[in-house]
Amino acid sequence: MRKPFATMFVLACSLGLLAGCQTHRAAPAPAVMPATSIELRTPRPGLYTAGQPAADDWAAIAAGGVGTVIDLRAPGELKDRDEAAEVRAAGLRYVSIPVAGAGGIDDANAKALRAALDAADGPVLVHCASGNRVGGLLALMQARSGTMTPEQALEFGRSAGMASTEARVRELLVAPEGRCIAQTGGSVRPEGCP
């Protein structure tokens, strides 16, 4: 009597494991990024940052596995080119989050960048003219999320291209409200925090 029960139990467990395998999607093998006219930084796997790619870079970027391009340039910065059309012609998804200089590095744009990154399916390229705004906005986003300390977020931003925008990010992180958010990840506020 025990043997049929044990056999049925093992069979049921095996079928359960096999059913679970059907829904598991294997992660794509990492692609080697072909050469482009610009330096592509990789502050973390699946996230590329850069200055302005040339029109003929999009095919190489797509071949390297990127699926989404997030452009932080403000309207009018890129004259005589339709970047959205170029990106889409290469088979990539295009997202525009206009960040006008260091002053455009703010909480609203950090939230917009977080939403765009979360919505992306696969590797992402985030760019501006030089990578400076990209690194600054990524640093602010990471500090505000509470996943990194402010210093870790600043280091992450530097690895993504932040240079002169670091002063703006530091200003936001040391302001009373910014300090409170960075310390708590936006959850319970310590005494004295708004």
Positions of PLM-derived features:
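Bacterial N-terminal signal peptides that target proteins for export
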Residues: M1-F9
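Cys-dependent protein tyrosine phosphatase-like superfamily
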Residues: C21-V124, A139-P194
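A phosphate-binding catalytic loop at a beta-strand-loop-alpha-helix junction
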Residues: L125-G135
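Bacterial N-terminal signal peptides
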Residues: M8-A19
